[in-house]
Design a protein with these regions (language model features):
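Short, conserved, GDST-rich strand-edge loop motifs in beta-rich repeat architectures
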Residues: 53-55, 103-124
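Beta-rich catalytic cores
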Residues: 35, 58, 89, 125, ...
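Short loop/turn segments immediately following beta-strands, especially the blade-tip
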Residues: 4, 65-74
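Blade-loop segments of beta-propeller domains
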Residues: 1-45
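Residue-level detector of Asp-centered blade-edge/turn motifs that repeat once per structural unit
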Residues: 42-48, 95-98, 155-157
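Conserved beta-propeller blade signature
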Residues: 50-53, 100-102, 159-162
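Surface loop/turn motifs at the tips and blade-to-blade linkers of beta-strand repeat domains
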Residues: 12-16, 28-31, 81-86, 140-145
């Protein structure tokens, strides 16, 4: 977090709670580190604030936190995670108010540097948009593109904006 009025960086306290927002097979310990990438914050249908974080370490996961301000300090309560299937490599996330989410799958995890360069130069399709709901991932039809990266969901209009950074 950063307070833009003071340019102060705020390192929140993280407490591990029961996994109620993720996949029950996904586990996290207090001692586990995070490898954060794309993030999104929404006010859920139940009025709580949910932060979704793509994490590349120690495993490929999507981490879910509740944000609360207590005694003038921000606290993150870990509320669950979702294991990312081995065939997917996520970049960004956009949450829905019901706790489900969309994520961009940029390219195969095992892509070689040569294949990545060729894909980038030719702007070939390398990934697509994925939706997670009811503890299951599904590919969003017609979302293939070259290097899908950042996304923003406008849920009330049922529109998602996708940045294909290689074309």
């Amino acid at each position: 977090l950063m307070n833009l009025a003071t340019n102060e960086r705020i390192v929140p306290i993280i407490s591990i709670e029961k996994n109620i927002w993720g996949d029950l097979t996904c586990k996290r310990e207090n001692s586990d580190n995070y490898g954060p990438h794309g993030i999104d914050l929404i006010k859920r249908n139940d009025g709580r604030y949910q932060l979704g974080v793509i994490s590349h370490y120690p495993n490929e996961t999507v981490e879910m936190f509740e944000l609360l301000k207590e005694n003038d300090a921000w606290k993150f309560y870990w509320m669950g995670c979702v294991n990312v299937p081995d065939n997917l490599y996520f970049n960004d996330i956009s949450l829905k108010k019901d706790g489900s989410f969309y994520a961009t799958h940029m390219y195969d995890r095992e892509i070689t540097m040569n294949k990545w360069l060729i894909t980038s130069l030719l702007k070939s399709n390398s990934g697509y948009l994925v939706k997670w709901e009811n503890n299951s991932f599904s590919k969003v039809p017609n979302s293939d593109g070259s290097g899908p990266n950042g996304i923003v969901l406008e849920e009330d209009k049922n529109i998602i904006y996708i940045s294909y950074n290689q074309g």
